[in-house]
Amino acid sequence: MAPPAKRAKRGWVPPGYKYLGPGNSLDQGEPTNPSDAAAKEHDEAYDQYIKSGKNPYLYFSAADQRFIDQTKDAKDWGGKVGHYFFRTKRAFAPKLATDSEPGTSGVSRAGKRTRPPAYIFINQARAKKKLTSSAAQQSSQTMSDGTSQPDSGNAVHSAARVERAADGPGGSGGGGSGGGGVGVSTGSYDNQTHYRFLGDGWVEITALATRLVHLNMPKSENYCRIRVHNTTDTSVKGNMAKDDAHEQIWTPWSLVDANAWGVWLQPSDWQYICNTMSQLNLVSLDQEIFNVVLKTVTEQDLGGQAIKIYNNDLTACMMVAVDSNNILPYTPAANSMETLGFYPWKPTIASPYRYYFCVDRDLSVTYENQEGTVEHNVMGTPKGMNSQFFTIENTQQITLLRTGDEFATGTYYFDTNSVKLTHTWQTNRQLGQPPLLSTFPEADTDAGTLTAQGSRHGTTQMGVNWVSEAIRTRPAQVGFCQPHNDFEASRAGPFAAPKVPADITQGVDKEANGSVRYSYGKQHGENWASHGPAPERYTWDETSFGSGRDTKDGFIQSAPLVVPPPLNGILTNANPIGTKNDIHFSNVFNSYGPLTAFSHPSPVYPQGQIWDKELDLEHKPRLHITAPFVCKNNAPGQMLVRLGPNLTDQYDPNGATLSRIVTYGTFFWKGKLTMRAKLRANTTWNPVYQVSAEDNGNSYMSVTKWLPTATGNMQSVPLITRPVARNTY
């Protein structure tokens, strides 16, 4: 083997990268993109090879193969070049001989984890016994001598690994209960949040989440195209807004969706993040499934009484697929409140996976007491040009799990823009330098005065010879008016156009300011003591004072400017358009343009969606209303699960239905969401507003909402996200 190599302190990297290149330093900060992150892990692995006395530059190693796997779908030029470079190296370079590869946090392929041969458990059990005896003796010596034990952390972790591997068939998992179980009990139940302070004000937040998921067999083993056409509602004149007409493809699969803040963080975590940090971004996501349990249900008639018998089924299987290439329709479950539950100690369920299918919809626009009948209230038939029927079985690699098996997705790296956790108060009227005072007040109750408007210096865009605060030019437009209560029509039917959420400036104007109305059930924050079919509802008002729209007091004036204006020279909120009552300029007026600045929609804890998939169109929207983070490349692959068909001996391939054994399953889902935040600098003299619990039982922040009752009832309403103000100019 060639002599050990030495890592250079400085190397060469192409523009736009920090680690993608030979011989560079390992402390260049955050990688610029997923390919650069893969290069960083590759460099770290090379560093471990070099420290162990090996030369990875002349040999093809496991680190090289990992880099190839991580960059196989790279869209950037550097990732593509690096990918093919190491593929070429693999073809010509000899393989690096090593007993153990250095571990990194690289992306691993999604798949089932295979179990070692049985003889390994025997050998490791012997090693465990020997290690335990040695550790006990060492512990006794250390405690009696009063000396510290070097590398105690590594020793503990090594012992834990041996113990987990030694459990084997019939053993407990990770130090659990005694033997008697089936398969290997794996994994750990962890819902902690860790904060690692990196320096320069940056914080790495690692949110761990675990849920017990219950899974029934699907209602049908078939894919079904189902039509919904609520003609009872839409046949009534003026009921266009109640239209539900659509077609959907119902699949026999279920979606395991963790894309909601309440899955990952507890309320006090959100309070801490929003009170102390100024911005937040996503880094990576890992998911796994373990401790799969599959059972069958049979009924027996004992003395005229039906009794259900539950048995473990060691041959039944659960099917798992991850749409890592985003082939299937993207259906985030937070929008319908069907993500995994928010309470780690309560079992939860997966959401049935279904997606829209193209069908035309023709619905007439009508109004109350209109004469005649509703002429158009029809749905079309599938069109060959637009029909897209996707099946999981034909688009995904499916892993089969049986009792005791486990599955891991590997690591996904986000490419998103950070979101601010502070709000802005500066409107256009508060940008720049205030007018010059001509006199100062002589008492605390007095007001200052300004130079006469006709004598002031300044700029306006009006053809008048005076300057006021109302007509001064400002550098940009903060926030913007936009049409609200605007229903557009597509070939699929009418829909309400989305609005950028803004702070409420008038209490009765929630719809005009884009407030979001959440309706949710007990798994996602509803009071568990509630009864009846109606869900709990909460209207989320954005905290962004600078972009609030006060539609009641806006107006438009004709040119040239005349003060005071005549009736025919001004359009106010009180003036109807045409001869209509209560339809005004704010319903059609839009001031969005190249001069417009506005805040990003804030995260909404706990019910809000976290990330979203970018629309596959040439021109992208600047933001999404449904989630604060939009993935610039593929979004994390949707995880889909279902129970494999468990048939009886009466199977008829020509029958309309399948004769199935009643089967259900449970499994533990575990995820790790890594985020990066920036600590908020303290800049003001005055104390700032903070998210804080109160003891007032009727207040919004009453602590009793997040405390259990005597019977365990819980509630979790949305928490404020941006409590602290910031300067924007």
UniProtKB/Swiss-Prot annotation:
The Basic residues compositionally biased stretches are 1-10
Biased composition range(s): Low complexity: 132-142
The Polar residues compositionally biased stretches are 25-35, 143-152
Keywords, sorted A to Z:
Capsid protein, Clathrin-mediated endocytosis of virus by host, Cytoplasmic inwards viral transport, Host nucleus, Host-virus interaction, Magnesium, Metal-binding, Microtubular inwards viral transport, T=1 icosahedral capsid protein, Viral attachment to host cell, Viral penetration into host cytoplasm, Viral penetration into host nucleus, Viral penetration via permeabilization of host membrane, Virion, Virus endocytosis by host, Virus entry into host cell
Q: Nuclease as a keyword?
A: no
* Pfam families the record matches: Parvo_coat (PF00740), Phospholip_A2_4 (PF08398)
Composition bias, kind Gly residues: at what positions? Answer: 168-184
Cellular component annotations (GO), alphabetically ordered:
host cell; host cell nucleus; T=1 icosahedral viral capsid
Q: Please report, in chain numbering, the residue ranges of the motif Nuclear localization signal.
A: 4-13
Q: What SUPFAM superfamilies would the database entry show?
A: ssDNA viruses
Main localisation? virion
Fetch the InterPro entries from UniProt.
Answer: Capsid/spike_ssDNA_virus, Parvovirus_coat, Phospholipase_A2-like, VP1/VP2
Q: Where in the cell is it found?
A: Virion; Host nucleus
Gene Ontology terms, MF aspect = metal ion binding; structural molecule activity
Chain residue ranges for the region called Disordered: 1-38, 96-115, 130-185
Region Phospholipase A2-like: what ranges? 19-64
Keyword presence, Protease: no
Could you provide one GO biological process annotation from this protein's UniProt record?
clathrin-dependent endocytosis of virus by host cell
Give the residues the record marks as binding Mg(2+).
Answer: 325
Physiological role: Capsid protein self-assembles to form an icosahedral capsid with a T=1 symmetry, about 22 nm in diameter, and consisting of 60 copies of two size variants of the capsid proteins, VP1 and VP2, which differ by the presence of an N-terminal extension in the minor protein VP1. The capsid encapsulates the genomic ssDNA. Capsid proteins are responsible for the attachment to host cell receptors. This attachment induces virion internalization predominantly through clathrin-dependent endocytosis.
UniProt record similarity statement:
Belongs to the parvoviridae capsid protein family.
**Free-text note on domains in this protein's UniProt record:** The N-terminus of VP1 is sequestered within the mature capsid. It contains a phospholipase A2-like region and putative nuclear localization signals.
Other remarks?
The capsids of autonomous parvoviruses expose a proportion of VP2 N-terminus and part of that sequence can be cleaved of to form VP3.
What is the official name of this protein in its record? Capsid protein VP1
Source organism: Murine minute virus (strain MVM prototype)
What taxonomic classification does the UniProt entry list for its organism?
Viruses, Monodnaviria, Shotokuvirae, Cossaviricota, Quintoviricetes
